[in-house]
Amino acid sequence: MAEEVHILIVDDEPTILLGLSHVLRRAGADVTPCLGRDEAEEAIRKQVFDLALLDVRLSGSESHAGLDLLTLLKQRSPHTHVIVMTAYGTDEIRREAMARGASHYCDKPINLDHLLGLVKNLPTPSSRSS
């Protein structure tokens, strides 16, 4: 990555959260990992992100809490790119995610090469209009 990209990762599975965080940090990103909805809401209120990776289903929350986080994130930071990820994907969830402003939708397990390609092809922070 030419410029450091600020990425929010939200997942309720610690292994996935740590794995994605590790891979993206090694690729040069500044990563904010959040284990669930409450941590994510706090991070969204405090910081602007270039990209967010949001799991749709978060334990301890409504069944599609990640979509609610997507809405909150886009309200606070409309230029943030969002990749929605889920192991429980349906066409309805995909349509809903895209309607709420997701840039991409990925089924789990995540193909890391595909994910890194998406991240590397994002417009850099300096090339985006404010």
What are these regions (language model features)?
Residues 13, 57-60:
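The short loop immediately C-terminal to the conserved phospho-acceptor aspartate in CheY-like receiver
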Residues 14-32:
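Two-component/phosphorelay signaling modules centered on CheY-like receiver
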Residues 28-37, 43:
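Short hydrophobic/Thr-rich beta-strand motif most characteristic of the beta2 strand and flanking loop
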Residues 42, 64-79:
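Short amphipathic alpha-helix used as the core "switch/output" element in two-component signaling
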Residues 48-58:
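Active-site beta3 strand of CheY-like receiver
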Residues 64-68, 89-106:
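Alpha4 helix (beta4-alpha4-beta5 surface) of REC/receiver domains from two-component response regulators
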Residues 92, 110-119:
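C-terminal output helix
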